[in-house]
Amino acid sequence: VFLFCGTARGQLSSGGTPRKIAPLKRGTADVVTMPAVSNEFLMWQSRQIQEEAGGLKPLRFAHTFEVQFSPSTHGSWNLSEDGWHIWQFTIRSEGALSLNLIFERFALPSQARMYLFTSGQQFVSGAFTARNNSESGIFSVSPLPGDELTVQYEIPEHGTSVDDFVITAVNHDFLGILKYVDERRPMGIMAESCNQDVNCAVADRWRAVQNSVCRIMVQGRDLCSGALVNNTAKNAKPYVLTANHCISTSLKANGSLFLFNYESPYCGPLDGDVSHSLSGSKLKATLDSLDFSLVELSTPPPPSFRPYYAGWNRSSIQPDTMASIHHPQGDIKKIAIDYQSPAISSFQSGFLKNGFRKVQRWDAGTTEIGSSGGPLFNSDSQLTGTLSGGAANCANPVNDYFARFDMAWNYRSDSTKQLKYWLDPAKTNPTSLDGKQFNEGENLCGTYTHMRNGDHHELLRMMDTNGVNSGYWSGTNNSGITEVAEKFSLPGRETLRGVSLGIGKIKNDNPNSYLTIKIYDVQGEVISLRTVADTVFLKNFFPDAMNLLEFASAVQPVDTFLVAVNLENIRTGDTVAIYHSLRTDGPENSFFLKRNGSWQDFYSTNPSRYHGNLAMELLACNIGNQNTDTFSTPEPDPAFFYPTVVTSTLHILTKDDIDEHSLFVCNLLGQQVPFYLNRISRRHVEINLRGNTPGIYIVNVGSGAFSARHKILLVRDR
């Protein structure tokens, strides 16, 4: 008998599986349907609110139904197969692309467990337990996909009082902030193409501080950005700085959900994992006229979140280079960069005069709705402001306004309206403070991937000798491949805590299909099984996204090892495939497969002799002084190309003047292809490739001081 542990996924929880109700003890299910709403109307209404906001940049994604549901007023009680008392209550809101709930008076007793799940338990959150209780009694849950969810509450004995919580809000997602269907955003709204993924080379200077940035879901319906900040006591107190127009009251702070590490693992638009979230915070300081709020998280981020506490600088001197890391449209983490000094400026009549740093034009990327509260960093990765709003977009990335950290410091003497009281408990009054990663030893964690700049995540089909499709090289197939694996080398005493898989394809009709994660030691030519690290039902994965699987027990392999995905328990008719890269040259192939009982590397097996690696990101702890980012480099690249997936226009930004005669584009046959050139400045050009056949191209650019080449993917504009 196989026992599946940890099938529940989502925010900080205790894992496990919902208990089954005894067949002879099942009562009538209780279902409540919310009043009908139109997603199209709600989107229109959201746009109207945005226009009236005068450039502020929060994102409204959900409609709130205020309710009062509790075990004494709704739902049905049953007995489980092992004698526990089970309360179930189903909520439906027709047309919702996801649902999330807010609880009040949330005070679970020590043995109680709560789960939330979609129809058929395809997606499960929990178990939530007494460790999720907070001083405020407010508890927010991450959205679950679809328009129906069930709350299951489990207690060992049916006491006289069972109202250990009240559901007070049902939030109907009309935009689609989860990746549940083939489109990354079902309503077609995601971050614009000029946005730069935070793991692109252009962001290397701010590599450490990116782990401070989080997406904030405010009361289940609005999305903003924020950042963990350090204080002079250097005690890892989990303060998050954001905008006042995002979190302005204690109620909003209590009902916020903070999502960390929501990003692509490499420089490409692969959707991130959404499981690293924490519910609730306490408002410490806020000031509407300077548009800042400081909150303290109810739960400190655990080591597996790899939290970094950003430093800050309260000097009034303007830095020469600025970057903002944020979540535009609530999408994966992006970065916008300005290589010029900002200007001191005013923004809107309701704010203090000259209370803002104005980015006059972004050199790379932009901000959008959802970016509100996002930090503005100087070149030393110190926070100098938080985004309030502005006019910037991809078409015209100009005029964004960031509330000044130096004014928020102590412009007002009231401790509830300033930052100094909270961020300088040591009373040393420094002008600046560096950021810090406080975890160490066994708690120091990092992530590792072989995806690199210039890669594209894709799926390669297999063909048999008759040219008939026989499945995927990195997934289910009819060609004898039973396991696919990624090879890692991590010298030291690191412990493996989990792995994130970039799932590219899922077809799941059989609820019993599952994947098994195995760890193999590699010693010379000998590959031996170390352990079975996890088993996960196929129904628990999101397609077209990274899916983090945290192991129940840490694994310590030898220095070189394989992280393998066993496919043998995928039932007939079901399909799964993991994204991978395809390279016509190095670096060394790290993608391996087990075929007919023996291990082979992908390069020597595929007829096109592609190199490759799986879209897999390893979570390891006890990493010592090793770099936690696989591809960070000490010096920025001489040229920056964006986007890497091009519909027509490619931008090239360089640190030195561009020589137009050095600029040419080749196809994979080495043939130069035509393009249209527009010089925006001495160091910024755009080339238009319209009329060329979709495919992979190599772009070359240079001057007397540098030369650079970059691979892009040209696609049709839909």
Task: Please annotate each region the language model reported.
Residues P109-Q122, Y514-V522:
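Short, surface-exposed beta-strand/strand-loop-strand elements in extracellular ectodomains
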Residues N439-Q523, V555, T560, N566-G624:
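Beta-sheet-rich sandwich/jelly-roll-like modules and their strand-loop junctions
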Residues A227-K237, G365-S388:
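Catalytic nucleophile loop of clan PA
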Residues D82-I91, N477-L490, M546:
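Short beta-strands within extracellular/lumenal beta-sheet-rich domains
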Residues L144-G355, V359-Q360:
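Serine endopeptidase catalytic core focused on the charge-relay Asp
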Residues Q11-I86, E135-S142, D147-N230, N439-Y472, ...:
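Protease-domain processing segments flanking chymotrypsin-fold serine proteases, especially trypsin-like
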Residues D271-S277, K284-L287, F377-T447:
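C-terminal subregion of chymotrypsin/trypsin-like serine protease catalytic domains
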Residues F4, R9, K507-D509, S513, ...:
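C-terminal outer-membrane/trafficking sorting elements
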